[in-house]
Regions:
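Generic hydrophobic, amphipathic alpha-helix propensity
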Residues: 12-25, 41, 66-70, 74, ...
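Hydrophobic alpha-helical connector segments
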Residues: 65, 79-104, 146, 152, ...
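N-terminal intrinsically disordered/low-complexity leader segments
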Residues: 1-15, 197-198
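Amphipathic alpha-helical packing segments from all-alpha helical-bundle domains
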Residues: 104-107, 121-147, 154-157, 184
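Hydrophobic alpha-helical segments that form the core
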Residues: 151-172, 181-189
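Helix-loop "lid/cap" segments that line or gate small-molecule binding pockets
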Residues: 80-81, 96-103, 112-121, 189
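Helix-turn-helix
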Residues: 19, 23-61, 65
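Hydrophobic/aromatic residues within well-ordered alpha-helical segments
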Residues: 16, 59, 66, 70, ...
């Protein structure tokens, strides 16, 4: 096979894998992991069921790859939202980024919500999700420490729980959820003088 043919073949494989991942992502976000079958994914992607197993060992492996990709997307923006020496600006940026993601990527949040709420059913995901959550809490703890919070770890855990709760409610209630008002309330809660946090 010529280098040109190899490049074309690699491009086709990559496009096919992206199509499979996009179809799986959409179906699992809409209907849930357990209800969505490999046949459903194959049909939505316009490929054979057997072809899916060329790229993924199992449906669980496919879910794992989807979650890793979703988490990777979030990590790519972290340097830009943390690009300030002022911890209050960074915390503000994190909160704004979170709400922006809820508005712009609702399917991703539905998928992540299902996975995080059912980690007991997806033990293969537990370590990945737990490690990421610990990392996010550690980042927020560092910011809250600089802002003068008396218990920065406790407050970071509270903030993570608030964000999780908002995410779940937004996914469940959808259009009726007052995202703008909740965002403003959360921004107001975490702005102000360090002395007020003790």
């Amino acid at each position: 096979m010529s280098p040109r043919s190899q490049a074309k073949s690699a491009q086709i494989r990559q496009e096919t894998q992206k199509r499979i991942a996009a179809a799986a992502f959409s179906l699992i976000a809409q209907h849930g992991f357990e209800v969505t079958s490999v046949e459903d994914i194959a049909k939505a992607a316009g490929v054979s069921k057997g072809l899916i197993y060329t790229y993924y060992k199992s449906k669980e492996h496919l879910l794992q790859e989807l979650v890793i990709e979703a988490l990777r997307d979030g990590e790519q923006v972290l340097p830009s939202i943390m690009d300030s020496p002022d911890p209050s600006v960074v915390l503000n940026n994190i909160i704004r980024w979170f709400f922006k993601q809820l508005r712009e990527r609702p399917e991703e949040w539905r998928l992540m919500t299902e996975v995080t709420l059912r980690l007991d059913r997806y033990p293969f995901m537990h370590d990945i999700v737990s490690a990421k959550m610990t990392g996010y809490v550690n980042v927020m703890q560092g910011l809250l420490l600089k802002l003068g919070y008396e218990d920065p770890l406790g407050e970071a855990r509270l903030l993570a729980a608030l964000l999780d709760g908002v995410g779940i409610q937004a996914v469940v209630i959808r259009e009726g959820y007052p995202l703008d008002e909740v965002e403003q309330a959360m921004l107001a809660k975490y702005q102000g003088d360090a002395g007020n946090h003790k």
